[in-house]
Design a protein with these regions (language model features):
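Cytosolic-facing loops and C-terminal tails of multi-pass membrane proteins
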Residues: 2-58
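Structured C-terminal helix/loop/strand segments within mature extracytoplasmic catalytic/sensor domains
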Residues: 45-68, 72, 162-167, 208-236, ...
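Short pre-catalytic segments that frame enzyme active sites
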Residues: 47-102, 118
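Flexible glycine/proline-enriched surface loops and loop-helix/loop-strand junctions
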Residues: 91-97, 141-142, 150-157, 184-191, ...
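Active-site SXXK
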Residues: 99-124, 148, 270
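Short glycine/serine- and small hydrophobic-enriched flexible loop segments
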Residues: 112-120, 162, 205-212
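Short, well-structured active-site flanking segments
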Residues: 115-132, 218-221
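Mid-domain, small-residue-enriched loop/turn segments at the edges of structured enzyme/sensor domains
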Residues: 137, 144-145, 157-208
């Protein structure tokens, strides 16, 4: 465990000079790094009416840990998956199976769907800006998969969806088993604090399938997505990840960082999430 912590710290501490400018939700990423360094928990809010992932935990190798002292006023769970040893470390299984909106973390798979259908390709992922004025300067420009993922450009992935069509998107969501597979929300925002939800454990399972290409998709498409979510590299390994921020009435209520660290001899999957408990009543009412 100490060796793993050291590797995570070394990788996470290396950042390109322009990284802060390129990645939307950098605050969430910094928080994640701090949490990792202290082996502190993934934090989430609890709502009795939220759907849950029915995980067959009895067939898994799980180490249950107690990180209660780190929570303060929050409730939640910590999830870590060690791929080589096939071991899960979990604090609070109830929160680890709780499904919430994926927000921009879903863009990993939306991009993959677009690549599989040829809407974009690894060689040509260009989509022209339509001239509409967006709240973030980086969004007001033509985009490629790399730039759209780095700046979390909503309109780029909405354009991919529009070209795919709801039927094809839903087929892919079912094929990979994405969370609750619920696209009943508005087609432009079903993944943004709407109908589509996923749990931290499911996020890890899907990232594992992405890493191993258990989907059976074209290898060049898998690699294109992995390249788009690569955050930093060092001699000890490479950090991949994606942030996601949920907003209700102009306030951030749900922040994700999902990702994994690939070293020479292992891969560690890390999906911490932070939700402000004070915002929960308003957020759940608006879902």
């Amino acid at each position: 465990m100490k060796q793993m912590k050291r590797r995570i710290i070394n990788i996470a501490s290396y950042e390109k000079p322009t990284f802060c400018k390129k990645l939307k939700g950098m605050t969430a990423f910094i928080l994640t790094t701090v949490l990792i360094m202290g082996l502190t928990p993934f934090i989430s809010t609890y709502a009795a009416d939220e759907s849950r992932y029915q995980w067959k935990s009895s067939s898994e190798n799980i180490s249950y840990v107690d990180f209660s002292k780190y929570f303060g006023k929050y409730e939640g769970s910590f999830v870590l998956y060690d791929l080589r040893n096939d071991v899960w470390s979990i604090h609070d299984i109830e929160h680890a199976t709780l499904r919430v909106a994926p927000d921009s973390t879903y863009k990993i798979y939306d991009a993959l769907f677009g690549l599989e259908e040829g809407v974009i390709t690894p060689q040509d992922s260009f989509i022209a800006w339509n001239g509409e004025n967006y709240p973030f300067e980086a969004w007001n420009a033509d985009q490629t998969l790399q730039s759209a993922m780095a700046s979390s450009v909503n309109w780029y992935f909405q354009s991919v969806d529009e070209q795919l069509g709801a039927s094809d998107v839903y087929s892919y969501i079912q094929e990979i088993g994405y969370g609750n597979e619920n696209m009943s929300g508005d087609f432009s925002s079903y993944w943004m604090e709407s109908s589509l939800e996923i749990s931290p454990i499911e996020q890890v399972e899907l990232l594992t399938k992405l890493q191993n290409n258990s989907f059976g998709f074209a290898p060049e498409n898998i690699n294109a997505v992995k390249d788009a979510i690569r955050l930093s590299s060092s001699d000890t390994g490479t950090l991949y990840g994606k942030t996601g921020t949920g907003r209700v009435n102009g306030q951030d209520v749900n922040g994700w960082f999902i990702g994994y660290i690939e070293t020479a001899d292992n891969t560690y999957f890390l999906p911490p999430t932070l939700v402000q408990t004070a915002m929960l009543p308003e957020a759940t009412q608006l879902k």
